[in-house]
Regions:
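Active-site loop-to-helix "anion-binding N-cap" substructures in soluble metabolic enzymes
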Residues: 1-188
Length: 188
């Protein structure tokens, strides 16, 4: 019932709050808070794909700017991306801006021709498979839970792949007591 939202996060999240709650005032204490991935696609790139494929749906990960969302046919989260892409009538899908999440969706929905641009989340993308393997060797009983924004080599090592909320739910319900978590800090 509040009328003012104070959003302490990156700018695209504040923009999303404005889009989802246009009747509310959204305040962003730090307008410089930004996510590099949110800008890793251009209108020209999207136009090139749209010119090349008649049957194209542009699917945008929610972690992007309002402008990029406006170029898209549908906006998804990491929790619902696979289900939404699977239900689209289009054969050709341009997934923007996160190539790693796009590759994950492509692997889960092989009936679609999922194409990506070279965008990525710097936090998730910098995780390397060898780091995960080293942690697995140190903690052999631990389950590996990663976000689908991680690169494909890291995702291949995971016991569970899911959104942040999915990882938390999985770890809470698992009989295991030790986890290697491949996502942003604070999910532990």
């Amino acid at each position: 019932d509040c009328q003012v939202l104070v959003f302490c996060g990156v700018s695209f999240m504040g923009e999303s709050a404005c889009l989802l709650s246009p009747e509310k005032q959204v305040l962003m204490p730090d307008m410089e808070a930004d996510c590099p991935m949110a800008h890793m696609v251009t209108k020209e790139e999207v136009d090139t794909f749209q010119d090349k494929y008649d049957d194209l749906a542009v699917v945008c990960y929610i972690n992007s700017t309002a402008e990029i969302k406006s170029w898209s046919d549908v906006c998804v989260t990491s929790a619902n991306a696979v289900d939404i892409v699977a239900k689209l009538p289009n054969k050709n899908i341009l997934f923007i801006p996160d190539k790693n999440l796009g590759h994950y969706v492509a692997a889960q929905v092989p009936s679609k021709n999922v194409m990506v641009v070279d965008g990525y989340c710097p936090i998730h993308h910098k995780m390397q498979a060898q780091e995960i393997k080293d942690l697995m060797a140190e903690h052999p009983e631990a389950e590996v839970c990663v976000h689908p924004e991680c690169n494909e080599a890291v995702v291949a090592l995971a016991d569970y792949i899911g959104s942040t909320s999915g990882i938390i739910k999985y770890a809470t319900e698992s009989p295991k007591k030790e986890f290697i978590i491949g996502t942003e800090m604070g999910v532990s």
